[in-house]
């Protein structure tokens, strides 16, 4: 109910006021949630029947990006080049009906070895407002999945209902997180490992993000460095888990002319990648989400079902 009211009145509330309210809520919540954010020790438990990462790597590194608005597309190539500088690959998720998604950009990224995913349908916050609403949007979402040859989905604002999401034609979903009490739907899955969601269609892999989102750290909390990312990453490596990050090119600036109040320097992201590559050289499996989904599915098909510890 509260979420429905929020998205109804949100268009009428000035952006600066929205940010002011969210920042104050986070400031209050952060003190209360210090024992579960950014690290929830429970989430580091190894799942039942877990197997080692491919090639005996110590942990998985998964880079994903949600392109929130049309202008964000203009920064995708710059962002991809930063990752290429370090020999890394990632996925870019676009919102099909919020802006015109550039087929030229999609083709460019695909040809460079990046993955394309579907991010919600129009990002209006209403996808999960009712089962009827969700099911009415399934045909369109599936249409874009097929048209883009995409196999992965992420809902707007990390809203999620895994029973409903399983009705999409996907191999994986990434609309959840291990722990994030600052999200509109704050129920984390409490694991830093991927897991299989079984359903009547066979199932799909769920890939929760495990590093805090950039918008939370740099826009709402106004941090100016990658220290929390690095601290959480080190903990994930220690546990042998999956370091999955979700960033937004929309909020990055690559030169001073693009600086703004809802921007943070792309150098912070570059700093994180440099840290990973230098400190953990040869120890990580940098997988595309679809590759990770196949890994999880193969384990499940071998009757070694990955189960979360409840």
Question: What residue spans do the PLM features occupy?
Answer:
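Generic structural signal for well-ordered alpha-helices
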Residues: 47, 76, 80, 103-107, ...
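Acidic-and-aromatic substrate-binding clefts and catalytic sites of carbohydrate-active enzymes
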Residues: 68-74, 93-104, 124-135, 152-163, ...
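Structural preference for beta-strand elements that scaffold enzyme active sites
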Residues: 60-62, 89-91, 113-117, 152, ...
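Conserved, mostly hydrophobic/aromatic
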Residues: 9, 66, 116-119, 153, ...
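C-terminal domain-boundary segment and adjacent tail
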Residues: 44-47, 229-310
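Active-site-adjacent pocket scaffolds in enzyme catalytic domains
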Residues: 27-38, 48, 140-244
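Active-site beta->alpha N-cap acidic-glycine motif
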Residues: 27-115, 157, 161, 221
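Membrane-proximal basic amphipathic "stem/tether" segments
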Residues: 1-38
